[in-house]
């Protein structure tokens, strides 16, 4: 009987020793936004609470400044 081993989650920001998450770093932010435009929760990504709060604020700022979309492209 084969056992399924779940990969260990780790905080990417802690591993890379990031001090603050920048709202202008769109490549990083896009990795934490789902296909539908929702912010992916930390229980799925493994991000620590401190960085999850910074991430949410940065994504919301980028959305407000029209750097990121609020939703998906609606089937375009």
UniProtKB/Swiss-Prot annotation:
InterPro entries reported for this sequence: Ribosomal_bS18 (IPR001648), Ribosomal_bS18_CS (IPR018275), Ribosomal_bS18_sf (IPR036870)
Gene Ontology annotations of biological process type: translation
First and last residue of the signal peptide: none
GO MF annotation terms: small ribosomal subunit rRNA binding; structural constituent of ribosome
Keyword Transmembrane: no
GO annotation, cellular component aspect: cytosolic small ribosomal subunit
Natural source organism: Pseudomonas putida (strain ATCC 47054 / DSM 6125 / CFBP 8728 / NCIMB 11950 / KT2440)
Keywords annotated in UniProt: Ribonucleoprotein, Ribosomal protein, RNA-binding, rRNA-binding
HAMAP family: Ribosomal_bS18
Any one Pfam family match given in the protein's UniProt record, by short name: Ribosomal_S18
Protein name per Swiss-Prot or TrEMBL: Small ribosomal subunit protein bS18
Gene that encodes the chain: rpsR
Family: Belongs to the bacterial ribosomal protein bS18 family.
Function text: Binds as a heterodimer with protein bS6 to the central domain of the 16S rRNA, where it helps stabilize the platform of the 30S subunit.
Domain of life: Bacteria
Subunit structure: Part of the 30S ribosomal subunit. Forms a tight heterodimer with protein bS6.
């Amino acid at each position: 009987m084969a056992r399924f081993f779940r990969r260990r989650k780790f905080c990417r920001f802690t591993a890379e020793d990031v001090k603050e998450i920048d709202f202008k770093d769109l490549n990083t932010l896009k990795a934490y936004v789902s296909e539908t435009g929702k912010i992916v929760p930390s229980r799925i990504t493994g991000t620590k609470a401190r960085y999850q709060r910074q991430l949410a604020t940065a994504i919301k700022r980028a959305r407000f400044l029209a750097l990121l979309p609020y939703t998906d492209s609606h089937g375009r």
